[in-house]
Each structure stands twice: as structure tokens, then as C-alpha cells.
Amino acid sequence: MSASDLTSVQAGAPQGRRQILVTSALPYANGQIHIGHLVEYIQTDIWVRTMRMHGHEIYYIGADDTHGTPVMLRAEQEGVSPKQLIERVWREHKRDFDSFGVSFDNFYTTDSDENRVLSETIYLALKEAGFIAEREIEQAYDPVRQMFLPDRFIKGECPKCHAKDQYGDSCEVCGTTYQPTDLIHPYSVVSGAAPVRKTSTHYFFRLSDPRCEAFLREWVSGLAQPEATNKMREWLGEAGEAKLADWDISRDAPYFGFEIPGAPGKYFYVWLDAPVGYYASFKNLCERRGLDFDAWIRKDSTTEQYHFIGKDILYFHTLFWPAMLEFSGHRTPTNVFAHGFLTVDGAKMSKSRGTFITAQSYIDTGLNPEWLRYYFAAKLNATMEDIDLNLEDFQARVNSDLVGKYVNIASRAAGFLLKRFDGRVQASAMNHPLLATLRGAIPQIAAHYEAREYGRALRQTMELADAVNGYVDSAKPWELAKDPANAVALHETCSVSLEAFRLLSLALKPVLPRVAQGVEAFLGIAPLTWADAGTPLSPEQPVRAYQHLMTRVDPKQIDALLAANRGSLQGTAAAAEAGAANGNGAGSKNGKGAKAAAQPAASAANADDGASPIISIDDFAKIDLRIAKIVACQAVEGSDKLLQLTLDVGEERTRNVFSGIKSAYRPEQLVGKLTVMVANLAPRKMKFGLSEGMVLAASAADEKAEPGLYILEPHSGAKPGMRVK
């Protein structure tokens, strides 16, 4: 792939010093930054630093996405106002981005005066142009909380596979999408009440307008990623299909956000004001720096505008956002760059396995943020492919590439140069053929970065590092140093090595900015730019005492990181044992803690205090977990806690189990359900009869604060008698 093939510069873009506005998606202001988020911010930051090193005028803009029902409810749960919540989360997010070297020119908030004014301006322009429609719609309404419910705040039974506790827009078990009205036995996740249907006036952006379709068909042809283009064409359909639907841009009070002009009690949906927040953050920066904001966003602007996003929000950024801008009289994005998702060790991030890793826990564990920047960069390319953080590979790659190949070059040469040659390089050594090779590679490496082919850039850089190490191994400076007669050769070897190290540092600077800063201080040079490839070290400027730039990853640090992020899970064996000891046939197991369902509170506290002994896989293998079907269920006379379950576990006869779940279920609710039982628990003679096992149920660690018991139900397809393993 030649540099001419790296087409990140759009046709017609200004040459020379370019003016570029860059954004990453806005993190939502009700949770922590985790390593999945960091993929995008690191990817964007590397690109921004690359362009800064070219000398372009570039601004990297971000903000917290602050509006919506989830923020409002989270604040209520914490006993604070939404503004207090988002101010605290902003500080946490800013801290995390700073820790990982994400170099925003401005990190702001969507809950700002700038964003309110811009959102209103764009809305009113769209309304004036005939793109806003007003309609009566019927929605789910929580009669207890007196609020309309977003789809994700309604749960119930999937109408297709009958999985319980599925969201109001799609089933996570079978993948079916549907309307909230299709759910069986729906309930509000806010209050638990059954929602009722209620009508309300809403406002829509008329994406179905033929003008939108015509514009978007033309705009999509400029997207850089074929996957994005294909997806957009799928959404648009063939000409005349009219597949685009109007977009509901309003929400009813109570809602944390901006009220729609001329519509009391109606608020902009968060996805309208969130992308406008890009411009609001930039406007805030322009006002502080004296920049001409309008010159960057007006329709005839010659500036460039790029959005880095995850592929899950492509729909909003390639349909709604460009159409909003086009028909409100603003410039549209030059391009949108989408990336894939992150897995850890080949699986989704998991709290129970400790792989749902927060940015702060990574820092608190003592891991170097530039290790993660390097590893993500090595995996990233210009496509929407998912990437995997394999923790063994992470350790091996960092230790091999960054310490073994790269940093080691400086440590091998600096000592000799300082002791023997006053820290000054040999002028003639700067013409060595190896250095010419490195200098010649720098433009292509920079081009790979600009094309978002970071993996290619780093592979080429490490190939060059291998060549430099081969040169050092061949020259053997440690042998040359033994004989004063070899002083000239030793001086040359050390000088070539340090200049090569400078060039490798230049190639790695977008990825390792803090290491590069340390290198610049060590070599006594100005901040490196791409133009400096041809400006070698000077004998006039002695290098300084070498300071270690990077250490190796210690496996114990990885273990500590996983432990810090792992949910407190009690072993199944301990839960079963506790249940049997208390004479109950029901146990529980979940990420918040596990205990027998009818244990006294004191026993529950002991079960959840993290003091349970670690068990081996052999111990766990002793437990026979089976799928069981509840064929009959009845209350136990004389007990206010127990239900008597008759279970089919795939044997010739059914089993009788007493379970302490009466407070959570009526007998008729359980008949016909599948659940999970401990099938090899010793039968226990109880007052009410013989209990021949134990069914599993989940509960919170503190049942007084968070009451409720929930039996485990397998996905559809499981059959009585199947082993759970």
C-alpha cells in the first residue's frame, strides 16, 4: 500500500496547512470510563497527534453527554440533583482521559448555554424549512411515577421465545425486535407497576422527506469505509422504496434536558442535542481562544470535520446528524470513522471474570497507560473490525516490542556515549545507511497513521527496531569498549544507535506521547514533528543522563487488575453447603453475592464478606447442576417461607424439593418453568418431608435494602436433565 493509496484527505480539501475539527463520541454521564470506551479515545487521539505533528490547525473536541431519563433517575437514586451528578461524573471522566493522554483541546458538557442555543437554532431552522412534524402518539406510561417510559425502561416476557425480563425494544435471548406493546406482562423498571397506554403530542424530524433521501444518497458516496457505505445503502434501500422513517426528537416531562421552544413540557430527545454538543464544545473553545466559530461550521466552510465513533451509533451519525446539518444551513461532516467493539480474552467484558476493566482501576493498579495505548494501536486499522485484548499477548507484546526492542536501544548506547564521548554524537555517523533507511520510512509510517492503519505503522516501526538491534548486536559495542583503539568505531555505533532511537521515537510519538516527551528531554531536542526526520542529532548538543523510560509488565499487575474488577462471587459449593446446613432446599448465586434463599441475615452477611475459601475445579466438578422442570408446586402448610416443588430432572421419577422462595412467587407462577438444581445434594429429612436437592435462586447481598428472590431460568432450548457446567 503506497502513500498515494492512503486516502484520508478528501477530494477538494485544502492542501498545505489544513484546518480540521475532530470529535470522539460523547461518553454518557452516568457511569465510569472503561477500557472499551478507551479504544475510541485512544484511536482518535493518535490520529489527532499525527496531524498536529504535520503542523495542521486541528482541534480535538469532546464533552460529556448529560441529558436523558437515565441521568435523571440515577441522580434521584443517589439523592443529588442531575446537575450535581453530571458535574461529578465530568471530573471523573476528565481525570481518566488525562491519565491516558487523551489530548482534548476542549472537554465540555452538553448541559451548557452554548448547546441550548445551538440546539434551538438548528431545530427552528429545520422547522422553518418544513422538516418538523407534530403528531399524537401513544406511549407506555408509569401510573405510579407519572412519567412516560422509554422502551429500555419497560421489561416483560418476550412475545416470541417467552424469555423473562426482556427490554421493551428487543429480546437479548432470541434477538427479536418489537414494540413495547408486544411484551407479555410488561412492567416499569422504575416502579415495577404495569404501564398503561397514554397519548401525547410529539415532534418529529421528517427524515422521510424526499429531500433527505436525495441528500443522503449523495452524501453516503463520500464515506471512507465500505462497511459504513454498505450499511447506509441498506438503510436507505433502493430509490423509491422510502425506507427512512421520521425520527421522534421529543420527550415528555419529567425529563432532564432542554425544553423545546414553543412547546412547554416537551424536551429535546438526548440524541438531538448530543451531536450538537460537538459544536457547542467547539464554540466554547472558540470564544476562549478568539477563533471564528462561524467560519468552521457554515455551509461553504473549507475546513474539515471528522467524527470517530463506535459502529453501534453509525445510524445517528450518518443519517440524522448530516441531514440535520444540511437542512439547517450548516456544513456536513467530511467523514465519519467507525471502529468495532472490544473483547477481552476473546469474550465480552465481564464483571464476574474481572475483565470489565475501568480506566481508574487500570491506573490504580499501577499499569502504564501507554502500554494500553500501544496494544490498542497495534490492533487497530481503518475497518470496523472488533479487536480483542488478550491479556497474555498484551504482556508479551509490550515486554517484547516496547522494552526489549525499542527502549533497550537507548539503554545500550547512552552509557558509553556519556562516559567516553561527553554525551556527544559523532557527526559522520549521521550519514550511516541504516539511518537513511529509517528516515526514508518515516513518511510512509506517518501516512499509515493518517489512514488509521495503526497496526501497519507499528509493524513497520518494529521491523525497523529489529534492524537497529541487529546492527547493535553485530557491532558489539560492549566488546569495542574493552579496547581504546576501537574508540572511533564505538563512537559511531553509539551515535548511530541513538539517532536510530530518535527516529523510532518519532515514529512512535503519536502512540507514546509521554515516552516521546521523555526522549526529547533525554536527547535535549525540541518536540518532534514529522519534518524532523531529516534533522539528525547534533554534536553541539550533548545528551543527558539516561532515565528509564519504561518498565516491563509484571504478571502480578495483571492478576491485581482482574481481582480489582472481579465481582464478589461465592462458590456454588459453599452456597449448597450453607443451604443444606440451614435445612433449606433453595440456594442463590449472583454477582452481588450468593446465599441460601432462606438463611438468617447473619449467615447472609458471612456468605458475602468475601471470606469464602477458594475451591479448585475438582471441587466444583463434584457439584451436579441439572436443568429441572417444575411440574407441580404448592405452598407448605405451617411455613411462611417454603414452597414444595415437584421437579422433572430427566430421571424415571420426579424429585421433591422444599425451597424458601414463597415470599417471591405464587405456586401457579412456577409451574411449567425450567430452573437449575443441585442434583447430588444429600437428601435431607425436614419437618415437612424429604428434600431431594436444591434449586438455585439469586438475591442481593443486603435483602433489607434490596429485597427480592429470583430463581434461575435457562435460555430456551434447555431440557430437563441437561447438565449445567
Swiss-Prot record:
Its main location: cytoplasm. Pfam families: Anticodon_3 (PF19303), tRNA-synt_1g (PF09334), tRNA_bind (PF01588). It comes from the Bacteria. Keywords: Aminoacyl-tRNA synthetase, ATP-binding, Cytoplasm, Ligase, Metal-binding, Nucleotide-binding, Protein biosynthesis, RNA-binding, tRNA-binding, Zinc. Its EC number is 6.1.1.10. It catalyses: tRNA(Met) + L-methionine + ATP = L-methionyl-tRNA(Met) + AMP + diphosphate. Its cofactor is Zn(2+). Binds 1 zinc ion per subunit. It is an enzyme of class 6 (ligase). HAMAP family: Met_tRNA_synth_type1. Homodimer. This is Methionine--tRNA ligase. It comes from Burkholderia pseudomallei (strain 1710b). The gene is metG.
